Amino acid sequence: MAPAAMNLLCTVLYLLSSFAQVSDAAPWLFSRSIPASYHDGRLGAVASENSMCSEYGADMLKIGGNAADAVCIYRLSLFFAFLPYPALQEDRAMYHSGIGGGGFMLIRAPNGTYEFIDFRETAPAAAFQDMFKNNTSGSTSGGLASGVPGEVRGLEYLHKNYGKLPWKTVMEPAIRTARDGFRVTEDLSRIMLHSTKNGNFLAENAAWALDFAPQGTLLKVGDIITRRRYGDTLDKIAKYGADAFYTGPMAQAMVNALRAANGTMTLEDLKNYTVVSRPTAQIEYRGMTVTSTTAPSSGVVLLSILKLLNGYKNFFRMDPGPLSTHRMDEAIRFGYGQRTELGDPLFFSNLTDYQKKMISDEAANKNRMNISDEYTQDIAVYDPKGLESLNTPGTSHISTADRSGMAVSLTTTINLYFGSRVIVPETGIIMNNEMDDFSVPGRSNSFGYKPSPSNFIRPGKRPLSSICPTIITRPDGSLYFVSGAAGGSQIITGTLQSVINVMDRKMNVRQALKAPRLHDQLVPNVALMEDEFDKKTVDFMISRKHNVTREKSGSTVESIMRLKNGVFEASGEPRLANSGGVVV
C-alpha cells in the first residue's frame, strides 16, 4: 500500500475523534471550487451515511487522491454535516467512536494483498470473569465499563508501517477542526436529549458541560459546539507521538477519571496495549472471492452463511422470494449459532481450527442438509449448547475504493452513546464501554440462554464483535464489491444481504441496499422483517413457523461496486435521509 495513502488513513481515524467542524485548515474543501473536469465514473467511489460528505470524498479523488484519502475527507466533513439515528455508527465520533475506543479495518492494497488490523479494546489486567455478576449496570456505565482503548496504537501502527508524512502533519487538520467548532444540528440535539432523559449528565457534570452545556443548559440547534480540550489532546499526540496517550500525564488523567468512577485501569494497562495484524478469511461464492475478517470480529460468521447458501444453485433466481428468504434465514440461524463459540484467539488454542471448520465444505454441506424447506426448527438444532448471542450495539462504517483497485472497509466504535459516560476532564477523551460486549457467567439473558464461555472476561482479552468488513473480487482478481455496516448485532445480516442482493438477485448497489432486510440472531427466537417485505413472503415465513415481527432494520449499510468496464457504483444507506454514495 502506498505510504501516502496510509498516512491519510491515519488522519481520518483521528478526525473521527475530533467531533468538530472543518475550519480554514482546508478551506478549499467546502468551497465547491474543485474543477468541473469530466469524470467517467472510473476514478473511484465513496459510500457513507451523508451524501455531502461523500461528495467531499469524491473531490479528493478528483484531485488525484485515492480510497484512503476519500476516507479521510469523508470523516472530516461528517463532523459538522450530519448525525444519524441510533443504530447508525459513531454519530460524530463522540457517540460511538474516538480515541477512547477501538475498531477493525480491512484493507485491500492495489496489488491485491489484504491486511486485517485489529485495534479493539482489551480488558484491563484487574478485570476478572465475575466482575459484573452482581453489578449489571457496571458493564455499561462507570469506570469498570471501559476497556483499554486501542485506536491511538492502531494509528501508530499504520503510520510506522505505511506512513511517510510527519506525524504532526497527519494530525493537524483534526486539531484545527476540534478547536474551531460547528453548529449543533437537529440530530445532535435529539441525541443529546435522548441520552439525558434519565439524568442530564451532559449539563450537570462539569466535565461534560464544558462542551455540551457551557452556559448551564444543553446547547440547542444552531448553537456552536467546540471541543478545545480535545484539540489540545490531539496536539500533544501530534507533537510527542502515541506514547503521549499511553504514558505520562494524559494516561494518568485517564486512569484518574476511570478510578474516580470505580474503575481499575492502570498506567501499565495503557502502556502495554498493542494492536494485532490478524489473518483474513476467504471463501468462493458464485465464482468470486469473498474476503472478510476473523475473530474477535464476525467476518467468519458472514462467510459461513454465504458458504452454506452457495450450495443453493437457484437461490433467489428460480424462486424470487419466499423459499429463498426462508433458506437465507435458516442459514443465518446456523451462522449465529456458530458465533457463540467465537472469542479472542489469544485465549483459545483451537479457535483457528474452529474458524476454518466454520467455512469448510463439510460444515456447509452438513448444515444445509439439516435445513428443512417446510419449517424452521428449535434453537438447539442451530446452537446445541444453548448459548446467548449478545446484542452488541454501536459502530460506524465507511466503504471507499479507487481506480488502482485499492479499497478500505472500516468500522470503529466506543460502543453505546457517549461510551461509559466517563469523560476525562483534562483531555476531553470520552471513554468506551466495550466491557459490555463480554459475556457474564451466571447471568442468563432475558430469554433464559446461558452466557458463552468463549466470551468470558479475562485480563487482556478482547470482546467479541459483530463487525464484518467485506471485500469481494472477481476470478481475475479485480475489485468487485466493498461493503460493511453499522448496527450492532445486525451488522452481519445487513452486510450479508448487501452481498446476496448484488450477487444473487443481480441488483445494482442502490437497489441492493434499499431492498427490505431480515434479521434473525437466533436468540431471541424472532425473525425481524421490514414492512417492505411483500405479504406473500411474510405469510410464507409464518407458515414455516418463524416468529415474524415487523420492524425497521437496525443496520445501516454502505457499499461500492466496480463494474467490469471499471465504472463504479456506490450507495449510502437509503433508510437515512442524507446518506449517499458518490462516484467520479
UniProtKB/Swiss-Prot annotation:
The keyword Signal applies. GO terms for cellular component: extracellular region; plasma membrane. L-glutamate binds at R120, T413, E434, S465, S466. Pathway: Sulfur metabolism; glutathione metabolism. Residues 1-25 form the signal peptide. Its EC number is 3.4.19.13, 2.3.2.2, 3.4.19.14. It catalyses: an N-terminal (5-L-glutamyl)-[peptide] + an alpha-amino acid = 5-L-glutamyl amino acid + an N-terminal L-alpha-aminoacyl-[peptide]; glutathione + H2O = L-cysteinylglycine + L-glutamate; an S-substituted glutathione + H2O = an S-substituted L-cysteinylglycine + L-glutamate; leukotriene C4 + H2O = leukotriene D4 + L-glutamate. It is found in: Secreted. Cleaved by autocatalysis into a large and a small subunit and the autocatalytic cleavage is essential to the functional activation of the enzyme. Its main location: secreted. Disulfide bonds: none annotated. InterPro entries: GGT_lsub_C, GGT_peptidase, GGT_ssub, Ntn_hydrolases_N. Glycans are attached at N111, N135, N262, N272, N350, N370, N547. Pfam families: G_glu_transpept. GO terms for molecular function: glutathione hydrolase activity; leukotriene C4 gamma-glutamyl transferase activity; leukotriene-C(4) hydrolase. Heterodimer composed of the light and heavy chains. The active site is located in the light chain. Belongs to the gamma-glutamyltransferase family. Cleaves the gamma-glutamyl bond of extracellular glutathione (gamma-Glu-Cys-Gly), glutathione conjugates, and other gamma-glutamyl compounds. The metabolism of glutathione releases free glutamate and the dipeptide cysteinyl-glycine, which is hydrolyzed to cysteine and glycine by dipeptidases. In the presence of high concentrations of dipeptides and some amino acids, can also catalyze a transpeptidation reaction, transferring the gamma-glutamyl moiety to an acceptor amino acid to form a new gamma-glutamyl compound. This is Glutathione hydrolase proenzyme.
